[in-house]
Amino acid sequence: MTEVVQNVAQTHITVENLNLWYGEKQALKNVSLKIPRNSVTALIGPSGCGKSTFIRCLNRMNDLVKNCRIEGKVLIENEDIYGTDVDVVELRKQVGMVFQKPNPFPMSIYDNVAYGPRIHGVNKKDIDGVVRNALRSAALFEETSDRLKSPALSLSGGQQQRLCIARTLAVKPRIILFDEPTSALDPISTARIEDLIMNLKKDYTIVIVTHNMQQAARISDYTGFFLMGELVEFGQTRQIFHSPREKSTEDYITGRFG
């Protein structure tokens, strides 16, 4: 694996010798990498290679999976998130996640975004500002400002996904994980989400799982290629796509297998 982050101060997430098992099946094998701050890191690889399992390790979503066992370290700003004193609720607030299919709550647009701040104790008088700022950051406010009390499910698929991003932003995370966020969307909605992700990296560290090679090339600064639970190669996206060091990386990128 190629080390690309020379300056430790640039590193936001450090993963050291991460192994994960579902029962007897090992899904991740000795994964180590450093994810730079305020960047977009794309994870690519064939279905079942471990990339979605990996990002769920970054906010301990795999804790919810029966018979899941993890070894190794995940450090966020030098704190081991698998330490015994870690508040997992606070961790998931700081490391937000947007899933493959939009999953708005069955409530109004406004209440979807206000939900997280409310349960985390944000003062009622501040909620309006939080909601509006989150919707603006997700490039959705102009489209919804006159119907914030309308059902979230009345939005289009692309708008629903941006609403889910706004909901994530409303609790002020430091890191945002995206698990194939555009795979269920049309090309126009996909382009808007991609533009949004590239804009958000100014304020957040972003890790995205994608099966879309062109998408990874368009929006990411760094790319990791997973195969059979192993991180085969990690580097700057330009290097991975134009001069990969590993033959399996080249074969995957050029479509020889998938």
Swiss-Prot record:
Taxonomic source organism: Methanosarcina mazei (strain ATCC BAA-159 / DSM 3647 / Goe1 / Go1 / JCM 11833 / OCM 88)
Subcellular location: Cell membrane
A GO cellular component annotation in the UniProt record: plasma membrane
UniProt similarity note: Belongs to the ABC transporter superfamily. Phosphate importer (TC 3.A.1.7) family.
Domain ABC transporter residue range list: 13-253
Catalytic activities: phosphate(out) + ATP + H2O = ADP + 2 phosphate(in) + H(+)
Function in brief: Part of the ABC transporter complex PstSACB involved in phosphate import. Responsible for energy coupling to the transport system.
Cross-referenced Pfam families: ABC_tran
Listed name of the protein: Phosphate import ATP-binding protein PstB
Keyword Nucleotide-binding: yes
EC number(s) given by UniProt: 7.3.2.1
